[in-house]
């Protein structure tokens, strides 16, 4: 019986950390890999690559824990989130806090193997991960903070590899913020009606009927900024083909969200994984 209870608890932790739903980790991973490949340039040192890949999964898990902790009073009122581990009682608040601390400590131990500049930048990463879940109470732009949190691995990657933060770093960082606002607005469109009822703020609510147009503008800006990164670093035709393919994927997302159907908005959000992958493949092939 004890094993059964322990197994149930582990499964609850598994759901709390979203390890059963890797899309968030992948959306965090791709920009990290972009930055590592551009900063190196080419294949980065294997230890640095391993640290960042492990750090992505650990900090994404920590972010999910603190997000659910912040939303524990709201999630029970939203159909999609009512069965999450905290509102359902499968995980206690104390257990969630402890799990968050463990995940952050493991991440920090990895960062300690890198240079001082990267260690200092990691403090800002933790602050962004902690602050983001609470922003949806106070501003309609929590997605901007999410973009900064998901993109902070970019300056950290440049720092770890080259101990510098060139213009390419900040253009890529800005592109990631705009990309995150676009895809998380698609995600927020799924819950928009419920969020309005319970007082949660989001860009989907702020943009209203202009949501599709603004998402489109953001997507064009992402492509322009990533094109500038390619130009500054002398990347080859492989990279620009990847931008062309990414533009096609963005066009498909616009088709999916056209009628604002919840299921299709979620499919559009999920499709962004392929955008990140395609851009990484273009970068990687340019450095072969």
From Swiss-Prot:
It holds the Pfam family UbiA. One of its GO terms (cellular component) is plasma membrane. It catalyses: all-trans-octaprenyl diphosphate + 4-hydroxybenzoate = 4-hydroxy-3-(all-trans-octaprenyl)benzoate + diphosphate. Keywords: Cell inner membrane, Cell membrane, Magnesium, Membrane, Transferase, Transmembrane, Transmembrane helix, Ubiquinone biosynthesis. InterPro entries: HB_polyprenyltransferase-like, Prenyltransferase, UbiA_prenyltransferase, UbiA_prenylTrfase_CS, UbiA_sf. It is found in: Cell inner membrane. This is 4-hydroxybenzoate octaprenyltransferase.
């Amino acid at each position: 019986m004890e094993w059964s209870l322990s197994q149930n608890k582990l499964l609850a932790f598994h759901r709390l950390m979203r390890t059963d739903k890797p899309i968030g980790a992948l959306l965090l991973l791709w920009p990290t890999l972009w930055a590592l490949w551009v900063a190196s340039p080419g294949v980065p040192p294997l230890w640095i690559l391993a640290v960042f890949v492990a750090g992505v999964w650990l900090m994404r898990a920590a972010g999910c824990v603190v997000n659910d902790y912040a939303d524990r009073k709201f999630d029970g009122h939203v159909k999609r989130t009512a069965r999450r581990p905290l509102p359902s009682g499968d995980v206690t608040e104390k257990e969630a806090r402890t799990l968050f601390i463990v995940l952050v400590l493991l991440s920090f131990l990895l960062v300690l193997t890198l240079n001082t500049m990267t260690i200092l930048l990691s403090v800002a990463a933790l602050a962004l991960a902690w602050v983001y879940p609470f922003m949806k109470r106070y501003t309609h732009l929590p997605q901007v903070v999410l973009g900064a949190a998901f993109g902070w691995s970019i300056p950290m990657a440049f720092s770890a590899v080259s101990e510098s933060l060139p213009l390419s770093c900040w253009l890529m960082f800005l592109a990631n913020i705009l990309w995150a606002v676009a895809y998380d607005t698609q995600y927020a469109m799924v819950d928009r009606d419920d969020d309005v009822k319970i007082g949660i703020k989001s860009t989907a609510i702020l943009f209203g009927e202009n949501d599709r147009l603004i998402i489109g503008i953001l997507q064009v800006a992402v492509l322009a900024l990533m094109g500038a990164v390619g130009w500054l670093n002398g990347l080859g035709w492989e990279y620009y083909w990847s931008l062309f393919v990414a533009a096609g994927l963005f066009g498909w997302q616009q088709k999916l969200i056209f009628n604002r159907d919840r299921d299709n908005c979620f499919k559009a959000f999920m499709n962004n994984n392929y955008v990140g992958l395609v851009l990484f493949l273009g970068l990687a092939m340019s450095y072969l």
